[in-house]
Amino acid sequence: NAAMYVRADSDIESLEDMEGHSLAFADPNSASGYLVPRFQLQQAGLDIDTYFSRTGFGGGHEQAVIAVLDEQYDAGVTWVSGQGDPAEGYTRGNLRRMVDNGLLDMSDLRIIWTSNLIPNGPWVVRKALPQEAKDIWSGWMENLHETDYECYKQVSQGEGPGFGRVDHSFFENIVAMRQRELEGSR
């Protein structure tokens, strides 16, 4: 998921309160930190260029959080798992990583909006590998959360239900969003 956050001491309580305020996207190449929030906000009827007083890029997910905490922007967007307690930074994602690394106290932020689910980036294998090697790799990844949960948490960067096989169709909506974004910038 993408999550829009503000400082906890902000008067902004919801997306509706964001009208006329500034928004930091994380990175132009990020699905959760730019592409999906921008698309879903537009789908909700918001004109990004006029609804917000200004938008910009924070220079990355962590940097956008810091920019909001330093009052350079009123709100920012970042990636979160959407699972677990928001007050702890969820189970995975940028906020959780910042909390775990001592860079963020979630009591300093408030989540005001979350996107629909966003597929995580894929784990892939070369087509040229022998089928047996592909099956071994895929089986190991699919069972990792059961066979070695601590390893799974390191690989997935947090808690979660495990990995599963998907094909290209699973990512088609992200590809389509990116293509629309590129066409709109021409």
Predicted regions: what they are:
Residues 125-186:
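An extracytoplasmic/periplasmic, membrane-proximal ligand-sensing/linker region
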Residues 22-24, 28-130:
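Pocket-lining segment of extracytoplasmic ligand-binding domains
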